[in-house]
């Protein structure tokens, strides 16, 4: 099993549009984000469509685990958005399940490694979520 397929999916979740999210997130997915909290697929998709996308992301301290058509990723992320000079740092984990020929995200969790309110406010994401 080549882990690069799953890591490529993960990178696209950070960088691509809401269309990728809509296609690759499982219907019953559970997502956990700083400030926002626990959300389902619909709420996650709505938030993704309203917030500026990241323009760069780097993963470090990567861990990959695979068993029975399920893949788990754990890593530290460093992301940057085009509209700000500020970076976002988080510890993350994602769980994917293989459905036919593609990987579907079933769970994702982020824990910010710095002041999350400041990070999201600078990116414009905090006001987008709470003013929707």
Regions found by a protein language model. Name each.
Residues 1-24, 28-132:
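A beta-strand edge to alpha-helix "cap/lid" segment located at domain peripheries
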